């Protein structure tokens, strides 16, 4: 059995990667919300309680839960040289540019001997006031004398609990993503080290895309329809160039079974940031969908070209339901509209991820409790809905 094997959105779920919200949320402020891609400041106690409830649903259904912070810590445990390399790379990617502060932050982090505690600290962010004042030589430093007392020398990573985005599982491999924003691109360092150095994954996972590529793609835009067909959204967070690049890499890999990629061109909007926020497979013949994308949605078929550097792109001029049925090899599909088709309810519940569900077993999905109209509509369609 390979370390990763994902060929469907709707087979029985066996293993899930999570990140439990931590002190990084306490380091959000009104001034940093926009830069750190948040609309509001979550209440950490409630966020952790909701996370724990979700994790319990998974474990109660015999799904193994692994944590990003644990895998990253286990990776650093393997070799002091890997830990040193990680710290230096983290400091560079945090935008710490002066040699003085690179050395001070390295010294500060290297004092944390427990690697899980260290990983959590890198996620949490580092305030300049945490650093040793003697090392900083504050009274003789223009930088320190004019800087804000509460300045973060390394920003927190509050988006980490969206673990699907930094990398996506595709068949027996991964897309290790270059994220849309600088803020989130730092998150992919953990997956880079896990896949390169963790004993459970090192040398066992194909890489179809790398975080150092020039084009941006995020995991929320990647859906495994079956072992032969991959769906990717062209969205605010994933560009067409990245899709062509990943298509070439997948098609030219000797072990892949994927021969078709369907590119869904969704509106470039904050409300529709990823394909999985507006379109999710929830059964062999059922999908949730936000009605706002049904009219303008374009779908393109991408297949292998005559050479390794070519792909063939063809626009699918048909109803979305017919396109999906064709590539899934079934007579028809049911597109279940968020908000039960009511546009006001759809827009409201879509903002709270009403179209975004997690399939955990045949006919069983996990949803957000607050989207009651959509959830009741899903129950009426015969699905077991866990809130």
Residue ranges and their predicted role:
Residues 1-387:
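The feature marks the mature, well-folded catalytic cores of soluble enzymes
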């Amino acid at each position: 059995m390979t370390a990763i094997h994902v060929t469907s959105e709707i087979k029985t779920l066996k293993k899930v990667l999570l990140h439990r919200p931590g002190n990084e949320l306490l380091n959000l402020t009104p001034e940093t919300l926009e830069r750190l891609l948040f609309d509001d400041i979550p209440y950490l106690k409630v966020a952790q309680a909701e996370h724990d409830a979700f994790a319990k649903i998974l474990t109660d259904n015999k799904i193994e839960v692994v944590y990003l912070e644990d895998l990253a810590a286990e990776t650093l445990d393997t070799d002091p040289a890997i830990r040193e390399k990680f710290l230096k790379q983290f400091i560079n990617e945090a935008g710490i540019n002066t040699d003085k502060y690179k050395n001070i932050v390295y010294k500060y982090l290297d004092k944390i001997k427990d690697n899980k505690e260290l990983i959590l600290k890198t996620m949490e962010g580092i305030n300049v006031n945490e650093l040793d004042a003697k090392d900083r030589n504050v009274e003789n430093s223009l930088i320190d004398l004019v800087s804000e007392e509460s300045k973060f020398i390394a920003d927190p990573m509050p988006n980490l609990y969206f673990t699907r985005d930094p990398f996506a599982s595709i068949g027996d491999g991964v897309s290790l993503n270059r994220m849309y924003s600088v803020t989130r691109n730092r998150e992919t360092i953990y997956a880079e080290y896990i896949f390169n150095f963790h004993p459970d994954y090192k040398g066992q996972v194909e890489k179809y895309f790398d975080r150092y590529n020039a084009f941006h793609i995020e995991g929320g835009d990647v859906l495994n329809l079956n072992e032969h067909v991959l769906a990717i959204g062209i969205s605010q967070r994933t560009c067409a160039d990245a899709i062509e690049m990943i298509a070439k890499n997948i098609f030219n890999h000797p072990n892949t079974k994927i021969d078709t990629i369907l590119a869904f061109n969704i509106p470039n909007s904050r409300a529709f940031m990823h394909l999985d926020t507006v379109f999710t497979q929830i059964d062999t013949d059922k999908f949730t969908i936000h009605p706002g994308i049904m009219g303008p949605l374009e779908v393109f078929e991408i297949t292998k070209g005559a050479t390794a550097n070519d792909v063939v792109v063809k626009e699918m001029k048909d109803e979305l339901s017919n396109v999906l049925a064709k590539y899934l090899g079934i007579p028809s599909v049911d597109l279940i509209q968020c908000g039960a088709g009511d546009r006001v309810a759809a827009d409201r519940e879509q903002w709270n991820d009403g179209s975004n569900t997690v399939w955990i077993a045949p006919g069983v999905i996990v949803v957000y409790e607050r989207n009651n109209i959509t959830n009741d509509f899903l129950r009426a369609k015969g699905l077991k809905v866990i809130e």
